[in-house]
């Protein structure tokens, strides 16, 4: 949850979750 994935998750889930990103504070982060 440190590196921003350049995607927001306000309205839709993180598409970048397929590469290990997760939603945190309306922004997708990679752990």
Swiss-Prot record:
The keyword Transmembrane helix does not apply. InterPro entries: Cyclotide, Cyclotide_bracelet_CS, Cyclotide_sf. There is a cross-link at residues 1-31 (Cyclopeptide (Gly-Asn)). GO terms for biological process: defense response. It holds the Pfam family Cyclotide. Keywords: Disulfide bond, Plant defense. Disulfide bonds join 5-21, 9-23, 14-28. PROSITE patterns: CYCLOTIDE (PS51052), CYCLOTIDE_BRACELET (PS60008). This is a cyclic peptide. Transmembrane segments: none annotated. The presence of a 'disulfide through disulfide knot' structurally defines this protein as a knottin. Probably participates in a plant defense mechanism. Belongs to the cyclotide family. Bracelet subfamily. This is Cyclotide vpub-C. It comes from Viola pubescens (Downy yellow violet).
């Amino acid at each position: 949850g440190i590196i921003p994935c350049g995607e927001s998750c306000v309205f839709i889930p993180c598409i970048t979750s397929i590469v290990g990103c997760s939603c945190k504070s309306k922004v997708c982060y990679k752990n």
